[in-house]
């Protein structure tokens, strides 16, 4: 029985640790390409007042660090460009819609920046 219990604890430990993935740190600002830099400027102008980009803490909205390095967005939706775009353009809960504020280039560049986080 002791051996079986040890085996179960070992299996449990392996299962727990396999779910603990570390997220790669954001790309340093100095290493961003031109599109990502413009996306950073869009973020600063329209997103920074509610979302941290390089700190894993909520401000008024969820932190955006590693947002595309996880399988799901903070809303629970799949972490992909389509779902993120839908949220940015149409808003969600407390987040205002940005569809009339951002043009397609701004949106594309913002997504490129979010992918660098």
Predicted segments, located by residue:
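Sequence/structural segment immediately N-terminal to covalent heme-attachment motifs in c-type
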Residues: 32-57, 86, 90
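Short hydrophobic/aromatic-rich motifs at helix boundaries and adjacent loops
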Residues: 17-21, 55-58, 82-83
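Extracytoplasmic electron-transfer domains, predominantly the class I c-type cytochrome c fold
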Residues: 58-59, 66-117
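Soluble periplasmic/extracytoplasmic beta-strand elements of cell-envelope proteins
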Residues: 49, 63-66
